[in-house]
Amino acid sequence: MHGLVVLLVCLAVGSAFAGTIGVSNADPFEREGRIVGGEDTTIRAHPYQVSLQNKKGSHFCGGSLINEDTVVTAAHCLVGKKIAKVFVRLGSTLYNEGGIVVAVRALTYNADYSSKTMENDVGILKLAEKVKETDDIRYIELATETPPTGTTAVVTGWGSKCYFWCMTLPKTLQAVYVNIVDWKTCASDEYKYGEVIYDTMVCAYEKKKDACQGDSGGPLAIGNTLVGIVSWGYACASNLLPGVYSDVPALRKWILNASQTL
């Protein structure tokens, strides 16, 4: 994930040109994973949520704990990252304090991930120590089927609360409820994306509500089931431009295999 300032500049450029060159022709680096319209929540309400951080404790991406030592996130969060410089904070409502911070012993991302199309945007991290479940730390299950369009889900994270002009991240975990849009519907004329939506993706939409920069890699969940991974989108909470997520059911086999072999 690019640094927040760099990402904001890229997103601003993307927004400025989207109207003239068309959504499908925009540079993929201008549409990184993007909580707008959300509200403060607690880690106890979403105990699977984790924060990926650098050595200084700066949050750069979200993730989901799926077992005692495995975190699922987006591939683009891990590209170029050195294991020794990545840490995971678990069990805290605040990204900058509380809970526990665990080092990472290994990480990988899908070999078929494309930074151009954002297909197969999934990766995992293996923690350096096993983490037991508590009231504030829980493993989340992987969905086996994509929920029908219109199903309500929740996306959480510490990402920017607005698009472009918010220069700091909220310290308190944010949550927003959105409605699932299957990939075929998301690629249809009903929305503005068209051919840039693929079968390893799922969308989620609610007017003036969305994930935003800093939320990348975080969970789109229904109950205790992970259905999506925050991946990308044009701007944040834009009209007829849903947030785009990696579809967990479509990528479940890869996640399980990587978790067992890494």
Curated annotation (Swiss-Prot):
Active site per the UniProt annotation: H76 (charge relay system), D121 (charge relay system), S216 (charge relay system)
Protein name: Trypsin theta
EC number of this enzyme: 3.4.21.4
UniProt lineage: Eukaryota, Metazoa, Ecdysozoa, Arthropoda, Hexapoda
GO biological process, one term: proteolysis
GO MF terms held by the record: serine-type endopeptidase activity
Annotated signal sequence range: 1-19
Pfam families per record: Trypsin
Annotated site, Required for specificity, chain positions: D210
Pro-peptide region(s): 20-34
Keyword Ion transport: no
Gene: thetaTry
Provenance organism: Drosophila erecta
Family matches, as SMART domains: Tryp_SPc (SM00020)
Family per similarity comment: Belongs to the peptidase S1 family.
Keywords annotated in UniProt: Disulfide bond, Hydrolase, Protease, Secreted, Serine protease, Signal, Zymogen
Domain Peptidase S1: 35-260
Reaction(s) catalysed by this chain's protein: Preferential cleavage: Arg-|-Xaa, Lys-|-Xaa
Disulfide-bond pairs as recorded: C61-C77, C186-C203, C212-C236
GO cellular component, one term: extracellular region
Subcellular location, record wording: Secreted, Extracellular space
